[in-house]
Every structure is written in C-alpha cells, then in structure tokens.
C-alpha cells in the first residue's frame, strides 16, 4: 500500500484507488479509466482497450455500425499507415460523399455506377497509404493474439506483448484511437459480408435470431450484432464516423493491462500517451420497454437439426443486487460438477439434455432454460415438447418451494468460489473481469465482495428469488426440425486495392526509434518439474502451485479410441457413473462436491484422462473416492440409452446437414481416405448393441496401460509421492503404450480436386492440402518463419491477398501441421471460407501464393522479432507446465525450445524463408477440396485451370450404418 500512496503523491494528475492488493484503478483528467493488474507469473502483458459502446447504441436504421467500426479500426490513422495524408484525404472525403449518395439511391444501375466510382477512389486513395502497417507494428514488438470483439454493450481491442515493449504498445494504441482513417472501407464491407455468410451457415445463428427477437422484443438486444441484411447492403461511412466520434471518447473508454509489468513504470507512460484524448459529453441512452410475456406466449420455428425447448423469464440488469442470486439459482439447476436439479434429470435419462443460464446485460436480463427432449432409441422418436416442459417445470418448482437439499446449496457455493479463484490464474480472464466491471459500472470490489455474498446465500434467498422471477409469465420457444431461410449475397464487380510495398509512414519510423529496455532472457527450466517412478510405467510429474490452495491432478493412461473405440461411449458413462454396489451417480457427484472437488473423464485418439481439481487439504479423500469410482464403476442402462440416443440422433439428423461437420468429414476423407474418423468408426448397429458389461470392461482394460500422473499443488514432493502411491488406482506390470498415434496421411502423386455439392450452404469451403516431409526440431525455426511470413495473423500473405486486397473471405488460413513425434510427416493445410460465386477467384489467388509466392524482404525484421518474443513468451502456465515439458521431451528437446532456437532466429535471413518455400511448398501436388453450391461455383473454370474434378457424395464420407 505504501507504494500506491507514493504513486499518488508523484502523479497528482490522476486519481488512484487501490481497493485491494490485486489491481490498481484510476482515471485520467479526461475521464479515461485505467486498470493495472501486476501478475509476475505471466510471461508477458495482456493489453486491451474497451469502449462502453456496442450494437445497442446504433441507430435502428443503420445496424451493424459497431461491428463495422471494429473491423476498420485496424486500418490506421492520419499517422499510422499514412504515406501522404493530404493527398489521400481528397479521395477519402470523396468516398464518404459517394457512400452518402449511394445510401440515398435505389436505382440498381445508378448504385452499380456509384460502386464503381467508390472502387476507383479507393484504388487512388490506397496509393498514399499502407493499410496493414498497424498490424505490422504490433508484430514488430513481438505482439501476438491481435484481435477485437463487438457485443451488445461493449467493444474491445486487445493483444499480448512483451513487458519491455510497454511504451511502444501504449504509444501505438493511443495513436490508434486518436484520428482513425477507415481505409479500404468498400473492401472491408465484403469481408463483413463473408462473416455474415459464415454465420448464416450455422443453425444456431437462426435459432438465436428467432429466440432473441421475442426474448428481447422492443429492445436493440433483439437484433443481431453483425447487423440486418438490408443495412449491410446499404452502408454509410459518414454514419460510421459519427458513431465513432460520439462513443469512442476517453470518458467512455478503459485501458487494461494485466501481466508481467510494474505499475510505477506504466502510470507515467499512460498519462503521457493518453491524456491528450479529448473528453466529450456522452448522449443519454434511451430507455426501452420490456417485452410482453403476459399470458405465457409460445412461438415455434422449423430451424433445428433436432427439437429443442427454450424457456425465458424476465430478470434484471447485471448491475442489480439480485444478479448474483439469480446466477446462484442457475447453478442449482446446472453446474460443472453435475450436481444440479437439471443435471440429475439428464443423468437419469428423463431428457437428452437440460441446462439453465443467466443472461445479464446492461439494460435488461433473462433467465434461460434449454432442453432437448428424450430420444427413444428403439422407436427413434423424441418425447413431446409439452412433456419435456412439464419435467423442467417440476424441477423449477422445487427451487420455489425450497425442496432442495442443503448439500446441493453448499455444493454450488464451493463450486462458484473455486471457479472464481481459478479464473484469475489467467491474464485474459483477469482482464475480462476488469472489462466487466468497467462496462457495467460495477463496484471496483465487486468480485472480492461476491465471494462473501455467495458464502452467505440461504435457502430463504433461493425461494425469494425464484418465487419473484421464475413464477408466472414466461416465454416458450419450440424449435422443430427444418431448414432456415437464408439471405443470398452476390459478388460485387470491384477491382483489388493495391498498396505500396517496401515503405512506411513517418509514424512507423518514429515508433521504431522509441528506445526499449535491454532485458535478460528468462528461459523455462525443466528442473521446475520433479519426477518419480511409482512403478515401472507409472510416472509422477510434480509442479508447485504458487497461487492458491486448489490442486489439479491428471491421470493420463496410454491408450485412446484409436485402439479402443468403445472408450468414447464408456467415458461418457463414467461422467455419470455410480459406485458399486449401491451408490448412484447423484450420490457420487454429491460426495465429490462435499469434498470441494470435481472429477471428469475424457478421451482422445491417444489417451484416456481422469482430471481432478479440488481443495488441497482434501487431496487424500478425493483420490480415494476417484479410485473407487474407477475400479468399481456402476454404469446405468438408462444412461447408456441416453448416450446412444444422442449419437444415433446426431448421425441421422445432424452430421450430414451441418456445414461444418460436412467440411470436416470431407477434409478427413481427403487426408485419410477410409481411415477418416467419420468412416473408420463404430457403426450405429454396433453402438446400439453396446452392453454395460462391455463398457465397464473397457474402462478397466484402459487402466492397464502406462500411466503419467501430473500433479500441481502445494504439498511437498515427498508427501505427494507417498500419498498418491497409496491412494490412486495404480497397477504393476502395465502395458507399454503405443501413443501418441500418428495417422498416416495420403500423398497425392498429381494435382487433385475433390468436390462435394451442397446447394444449402451460403459459403463455399475451400481446403488446400498436401503431405509434407518428416519433422525434426532442427527445422522448427524454418517452419515457423515460413508460416509467419505466409499466413501469420493479419500480416501474412494469405490474409493480405485473400482478405485485405481481394475481399474474398472473412476467414483464411494456412500452415503446416506438425506431429507430436520426430520423424513423422508434417502436412500443409490451407482454408478459405467464401461465397460460392467467389470460389474460383479465391482458388486462383491461393494457388498463385503457393506456386509463385510474392517476396517482401522488408518483413524479415518484424518476423524475427515476433519469433524471438513468441518463444520467450511461450512459457506454459504452472497448471500445464509438466504436460508441455513432457511433450517437448517427446519431440527431442532437452532444454527450453527458446534457448535451443535463439541463435538460429538471430541469424535468420529472408533467403532462408525462400529456400524453405522452394523445397517444401512450391509446385507440390496439391489436393484442392471444395464444398459449395454447384449451380454457382464456376466448376468448368476450375477444372480447366487445375484438372479433373472428382465429385463426392455424403455417402462416401461417412460410415455405412
């Protein structure tokens, strides 16, 4: 506290409040709110700027402005990216005027002419700017994770960066919001349209639209954040500028820093960089009427792959004093420990799924319950919505009558307290907490006081809250199976925007001259993890927990579904298993909750996992309970039927319709042919015939394999070795693991094209694949340098050529996938999601990048800086340290990869990237994989350019049932 007082004395221009030892918050005279949370367990700093403005603040005639603004605030300012602002401004002003005229014009021919004029002005303006300079500068300081997000009540911009680059990061972000220029607006609109297309192909988008239109009727919360279709097609740049000038002001803005920095270093820099931003009077927000739920309105729509029932109750805004109690009640219904009332009816097979959540926002709130009716595997029919709703209402009534056990209340208390404590182990989660405090104007001690409030919750509180908010009128939404109607967008006739290369703004020159502190590199020390062999093939990995009193314990058995396919279903049952002879699932969940612990089972192709987390003082009891569960599982036939029903209904009703599943199945087929996960799997007949005895035996057999135990906690190494050795289900003479299993990828001996016709999708999915060479850590820097140049974030060629220059896609990516073991092959995978009428153009651009890669030598300095800082900042959290060290050892590292590769990074030349490209990428036999509408995609042009197209059907991609 003395340090904080001293800072107050020195920096009298700011008002500082340190309500706890966790973080410091203060305001600059212009109203900018600052949150600083030092955490020297973090390897870097997470920085964000958040605005208390989102889609609710848009004029109803111009929805989508907040989201548009998020996109174009990456395009620079009158300084960042400006090569000659005065010359550029002439064209920029013309573009603004043309968009105003465009918005007032309804004649299609006139609108086409205006689009052409805007395109011409954009091309001219681009001659005097370098649009991706901002992202290049972030890369030049070793920044990563650059992104932004828009929601109803807020918009946030963020990335990670090394602590010694603090001054540069602050300088860059202060300038970012000073005088932004919304460059290449026309091209970026196309990228937003592609984002819209992507969401249109997701069924949950249409379900959410339908739900929110009634749930928040009469409020902007009822509309989509991305904006209405008609508004997306009729943009107005002047309105975007007006929105920015209104809401993006310092007194509506917060700067958040979390991580490995010093508060006393940050405060004077923040004052110097951000104090000049001009404070403005904010408009008064309108007050909206609540939706009318009188007479229990019911609505239905045919939008889903399977039926669903949604119940909505009116509650309160997030700032209301009842919010935490409503959240507590939601946890009484469903929670991570599966002890809730709705968890119970799910585990008992009364429904396929049921869950509750609290949706609290600035102006209003809703309590939501979602349920999927029970699926009868014999009749292959769902239970009725009416019967499902009756089951749900019965559980809600228990809360209202206080008909709940005391242990459940205590279980929820311990779970919520534990989750809150674990959440602040992560820098981004901490920033999220501060962001919530700012956006919703919560008390600064909100999260600390929340713990005391949770501890004090009584059964009377629960009855009062549920009788007040979950009684009487509510909204019921029934989702039935059916196809949503989609809005079709067409490709505009606009030319690519070319930008100068090999140059930079005066700002960039000054920015790069800002001095940085010469810091000593700190590397990972493998000795921070201790090891002990408890038996042959049973190895303990021990890491100290420096933060709190919650241990984590992971048991990783050396076998997975690749060798034992039934484990997929056995593991699901283990998460709702009892213990023989008499303990049912709910009793087991209760016992874990009474020990303040959670226990979950999971499985991958390679490993079976048992994950425990809980109070350190109860470690021995928790381990004993888990051991009994593992050795004596009591699996239930009704649960088995529910799990089988979920799998059968998914395969019959969802997987051949869902665009993302189809895309994954198509890609899996191209990579693995008949060894695809969607083909080489248990059939429905086999699944339907599964017996409890088989599934129980599968779990027991899986625990016969080699075992790695990863413990993170505060007990001494010696104590842990003894305690775990005596209380875990350990075996002598375990089987040698064959994991990790690396599936053999197909190598194509000539260029190949596969096409899956799908007239239902709005967006074509394009993949580019070829098998690579055996991997060695000696080539690690070569792989990473090439990928950073070719497709690294916003700076890579893929995003620049596909998205920024040609407006082909919202999502475009590429890179090499590396195996978990040396000597196994890598493979290359590229992806573009684009409108079907752009597919042929997008393929041409990507193939040109692969076979005739542009060379911008000036990027090598930024790439080296990024790689260097990425390695140095690549320190695993204490929770994951032992597992990541183990993975590194498997690859052949005997020391921190950063230390191993630093000399090679320092000596990296652009010619090394070109050499890697020519040896590993150029003129490879690429498999081009396409899914989209055959009536719109120019297949003839693609076939003429790249060879014969092999047409596939969905039946080829999935196992025969």
How should each PLM-predicted stretch be described?
Residues 193-200:
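Carboxylate/His-rich catalytic cores and anion/metal-binding grooves
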Residues 60, 72-84:
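Metal-associated gating/positioning segment near the N- to mid-region
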Residues 19-33, 262-301, 338, 343, ...:
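Proteolytic maturation boundary segments
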Residues 175-182, 274-281, 392-404, 627-637, ...:
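A common structural junction motif
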Residues 37, 42-55, 64-65, 82-175, ...:
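M16 family metallopeptidases and their MPP-like homologs
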Residues 4-14:
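Sec-dependent N-terminal signal peptides
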Residues 63-71, 75, 564-572, 784, ...:
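Active-site recognition of the HExxH zinc-binding catalytic motif
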